[in-house]
Swiss-Prot record:
Documented EC number(s): 1.14.14.-
Gene: pytD
UniProt source species: Aspergillus terreus (strain NIH 2624 / FGSC A1156)
Traits of the deletion mutant: Abolishes the production of most pyranterreones, but accumulates high amounts of pyranterreone 5.
Positions annotated to bind heme: 321
Task of the protein: Cytochrome P450 monooxygenase pytD; part of the gene cluster that mediates the biosynthesis of pyranterreones, a family of antioxidative compounds. The first step of pyranonigrins biosynthesis is performed by the hybrid PKS-NRPS synthetase pytA that condenses 4 malonyl-CoA units ato the acetyl starter unit by the modular PKS of pytA. The acyl chain is then connected to an L-serine through the amide bond by the modular NRPS of pytA. A tetramic acid is formed and released from the PKS-NRPS pytA to give pyranterreone 5 with the help of the thioesterase pytI.
Statement: the UniProt record of this protein carries the keyword Oxidoreductase: yes
Cofactor(s) listed: heme
Protein name: Cytochrome P450 monooxygenase pytD
Amino acid sequence: MGLFLNKIVIPGYFSHLRSMVGSLSRGISRKATLEYYAQVADEETAKAVDGWTCKSEAEKSVALFEEISFLVHKIIVRCLMGQDFYDHHVRELYDLLRTMEANVGSIWHTVLPGWVAHGPARRLWRCRQRVQEIFDFRLRERERSPEEWKKRLDYISYTLQDPATAHLSRFYGAHHTLLMFAAHTSTVASISWILLEWKSPHRLQRLREELATHALEQSPFLDALVKETGRHYSGNSDVRWARKPKTLRTEVASVPESRITIPEGTIVSISPYLTHHDPATWDNADTYLPERWLADPDLAKKMNEGGQLRYIPFGAGSHRCPGEKMAILIAKIAVARIVQSCDLAWGEGSSENTLGGLDFSKVGSPWLKGDVQVRFQV
């Protein structure tokens, strides 16, 4: 699906991709920025918990992934776009994101030329245009009071002052559309799957006790939960074009020392999900086991030693996700706030036996097919 993301950005954006990504790496990794993001994530999660637990008895059952999806979206909009986008456009931007998610992977993008106005293409074009209109309007509004926004910590305020990106404001809408895709799906999956894994009372109690005595960033078990969720449920595919021929050795038991040559120009897809479930690499590969990270705190580093990439929830090398710190921070804060505030119970018609399979249709880690109804209880 990542091959079709060019359908949701305006022409010319990818010519400036390197500048935009460089600005992102700098802008969201500053200490003050991460502290602000942590505050936003905690505030939004607290508001969400209040809403979930204050519903009337008949309305308490909610769709878990859908609820976490809107929560993460609100955090992303406040952190990356700013309070003005949040106050005026947060719901509309969410609806636009969902429409784009539903249409970006259409088979028609593959079998028809890019200029053919088929249904999914038209819907993507309309969404792209509306996002651009929102950004054009909000940036004009900011120009009226530049001093008010100069010291803000949202990412747009940074890019407007960064010499590498200040002159590229016409591409901000496209840039943030891609960021919504990149930051949203996998963060939602991380939080939601951790919450579903609460079915182990021992793990839930252990996390609560640890959070009661440790600062969030010093909680080994919370860190282990995030790492194991990234291993067990990671599904984003890394797609690359081979720039030159490359010969690789393949480990096929029936063909010793077998090799394969990848021709120049070949599209190569790497599956973190299959890598993370390889029994030759991981003990109990198909079992969700956060304790593995407590038994060996250096496990992530060891898995990628010697040029081997066996743990890649955020990619690797020059293609490693620049938003890794932000995504982990949001996931940890959301989980910590929820686990310290309420319990999670099955909702109407849902149980462990009714859970569907994994939904790999999104850009990022898989969600649960059909979602699941849950109740957040004080």
